């Protein structure tokens, strides 16, 4: 908290020209309330069934770390109603609301903790891969975890394991709570993005080679690879009605410097700071939408045709019309807004906000609550 039929992608200046057509001025500034929760919070999920917000808490990495847990919040007041203790640091989350399960990514331990959100307790920890002998002779994990996504109907959990030497997709049987397949080919680079097309039986991932890699969930193999005109494709949202992919193209200098060192022959294709919109079937670039600095998480509300995007460096949440790409509203938050969850019934957005740790590392991260119009 981040690969056989080859698909083409539109290039040239098309995306740049289209970006200029989109207004970067919001019609209104929406208010937000936020509350400090704990050190080292990352992703969160809203459960309509439990009417609760669940937040992954790593405990942070300061000299005085907090305790890893899942914090259960009241969605109205943001008060912590329950702390579900974990043995391993928590980062990403995926919710299976129908089955009362929250899957929590333990990035540093290459595992997933399964939480029963009805009983507020840990059910099991799934080890995705063991340690291997590293270059210094010591055992170490070869991959990091980032995103998780659940296919509830088919009892599957998909988790990206990314590595410069070859990113993979872990496939977990959620009935047996065990890994049944490790799919290679997600690219020799970090693979941060992950989204599921449940109806089409496809998983889409992104990597820092600027690719979108498509996996068939039935054959459990990579079927397409799209080279995009982006450098840092991060999180992905999928619009099932129009078969479009929305991807945050981050544009951070720190990542650009990392790419220059780790990717042979790396040349920048785009400065980022935008939402890249692609045809999910062909990889064709449909639109390039400018957004505030450091875009990361997205949440698509297909029914209302709204797209919500966090910008970490820009300290904002932006609200777009997902059809016209017009910027409708913005929400000013403290640095650094990160992950998004949505209560669709109440039309309320929840956002994790990372504290500035550059001073003493003792500040707690917060969760913001935004009532949408």
Q: Locations of the language-model features?
A:
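Predominantly soluble domains enriched in secretory-pathway, periplasmic, or organellar proteins
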Residues: 9-373
């Amino acid at each position: 908290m981040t690969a056989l039929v080859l698909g083409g992608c539109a290039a040239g200046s098309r995306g740049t020209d289209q970006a200029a057509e989109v207004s970067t001025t919001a019609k209104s500034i929406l208010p937000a309330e936020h509350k400090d929760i704990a050190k080292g919070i990352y992703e969160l999920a809203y459960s309509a069934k439990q009417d609760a917000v669940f937040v992954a808490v790593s405990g942070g990495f300061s000299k005085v770390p907090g305790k890893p847990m899942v914090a259960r919040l009241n969605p109205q007041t943001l008060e912590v109603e329950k702390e579900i203790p974990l043995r391993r640091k928590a980062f990403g989350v995926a919710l299976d609301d129908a089955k009362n399960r929250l899957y929590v990514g333990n990035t540093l331990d290459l595992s997933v903790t399964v939480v029963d959100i009805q009983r507020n307790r840990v059910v099991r920890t799934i080890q995705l891969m063991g340690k291997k002998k590293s270059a210094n002779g010591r055992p170490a994990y070869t991959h990091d975890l980032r995103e998780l996504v659940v296919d509830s109907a088919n009892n599957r959990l998909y988790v990206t394991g990314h590595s410069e030497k070859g990113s993979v997709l872990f496939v977990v049987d959620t009935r047996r709570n065990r890994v049944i397949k490790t799919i290679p080919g997600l690219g020799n680079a970090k693979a941060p993005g992950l989204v599921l097309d449940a109806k089409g039986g496809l998983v889409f991932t992104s990597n820092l080679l600027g690719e979108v890699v498509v996996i068939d969930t039935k054959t459990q193999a990579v079927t397409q690879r799209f080279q995009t005109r982006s450098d840092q494709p991060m999180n992905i949202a999928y619009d099932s009605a129009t078969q479009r992919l929305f991807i945050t193209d981050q544009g951070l200098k720190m990542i650009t410097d990392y790419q220059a060192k780790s990717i042979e022959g790396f040349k920048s294709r785009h400065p980022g700071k935008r939402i890249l919109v692609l045809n999910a079937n062909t990889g064709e670039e449909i639109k390039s939408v400018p957004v505030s600095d450091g875009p990361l998480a997205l949440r698509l509300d297909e029914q209302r045709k709204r797209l919500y995007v966090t910008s970490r460096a820009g300290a904002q949440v932006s609200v777009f019309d997902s059809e016209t790409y017009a910027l409708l509203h913005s929400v000013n938050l403290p640095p650094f807004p990160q992950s998004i969850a949505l209560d669709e019934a109440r039309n309320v957005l929840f956002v994790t906000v990372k504290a500035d740790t550059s001073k003493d590392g003792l500040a707690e991260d917060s969760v913001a609550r935004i009532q949408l119009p």
